[in-house]
């Protein structure tokens, strides 16, 4: 029987820590995530983050000017996100401007995406623990305790590929095998521990 993880300390924080640092550093649209999502000097697509989690990717994209809809099906994680967004908005300035471009929804992305018809969909499934779970960051263990794994990730990707107007981005472990059942991505953008499999349907304008 697996040990239950204490999630009471988990907080969604867009102001401090790594997120706040990235926000203040102003790395811009040259970052891997931004490039994968199609943000360029001439294009700022509307994006749906279909697996919101802690909302960090969505916040980064919104800070770069994109309108981002976050979908989270876990009620507890949705509540943590709502609290984090409210705290960021209270900071005012660029934080408030960024939050104003974000819309948080509670629900199943597979059901919501067809009606939203977004330009870009970002999918970042929760992966089963690999190797010794003690080596996995505490925060990630807490998130997994709340949202579980995503055994329906392939189905979500298929729905996303149908619903997206322009592209779907799958955030995936760098050295992991491709997700079963998907066609070959149009291209990949590689990070230090993550890769973005990009499935292009139409050019962004």
From Swiss-Prot:
UniProt binding sites for S-adenosyl-L-methionine: 56-57, 72-73, 124
Main location: cytoplasm
EC identifiers of the protein: 2.1.1.242
Pfam families registered for this protein in UniProt: SAM_MT
GO CC term (a single one): cytoplasm
GO molecular function: rRNA (guanine-N2-)-methyltransferase activity
Reaction(s) this enzyme catalyzes, per UniProt: guanosine(1516) in 16S rRNA + S-adenosyl-L-methionine = N(2)-methylguanosine(1516) in 16S rRNA + S-adenosyl-L-homocysteine + H(+)
Superkingdom, natural source: Bacteria
Keyword terms: Cytoplasm, Methyltransferase, rRNA processing, S-adenosyl-L-methionine, Transferase
Cell location: Cytoplasm
Family per record: Belongs to the methyltransferase superfamily. RsmJ family.
Function: Specifically methylates the guanosine in position 1516 of 16S rRNA.
Protein's recorded name: Ribosomal RNA small subunit methyltransferase J
Origin organism lineage: Bacteria, Pseudomonadati, Pseudomonadota, Alphaproteobacteria, Hyphomicrobiales
Gene: rsmJ
């Amino acid at each position: 029987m697996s040990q239950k993880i204490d999630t009471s300390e988990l907080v969604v924080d867009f102001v401090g820590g790594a997120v706040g640092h990235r926000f203040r550093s102003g790395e811009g649209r040259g970052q891997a995530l931004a490039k994968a999502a199609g943000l360029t000097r001439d294009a700022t697509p509307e994006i749906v983050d279909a697996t919101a989690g802690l909302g960090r990717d969505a916040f980064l994209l919104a800070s770069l000017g994109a309108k981002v809809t976050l979908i989270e099906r876990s009620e507890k994680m949705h509540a943590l996100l709502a609290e984090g967004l409210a705290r960021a908005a209270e900071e005012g300035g660029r934080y408030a401007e960024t939050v104003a471009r974000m819309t948080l929804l509670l629900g199943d992305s597979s059901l919501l995406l067809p009606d939203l018809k977004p330009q870009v969909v970002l999918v970042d499934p929760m992966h089963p623990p690999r190797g010794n779970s003690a080596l996995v960051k505490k925060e990630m263990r807490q998130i997994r305790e709340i949202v579980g794994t995503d055994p329906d990730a392939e189905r979500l990707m298929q729905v996303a590929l149908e619903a997206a107007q322009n592209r779907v981005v799958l955030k995936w472990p760098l050295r992991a095998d491709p997700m079963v059942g998907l066609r070959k991505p149009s291209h990949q953008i590689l990070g230090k521990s993550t890769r973005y499999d990009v499935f292009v349907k139409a050019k962004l304008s």
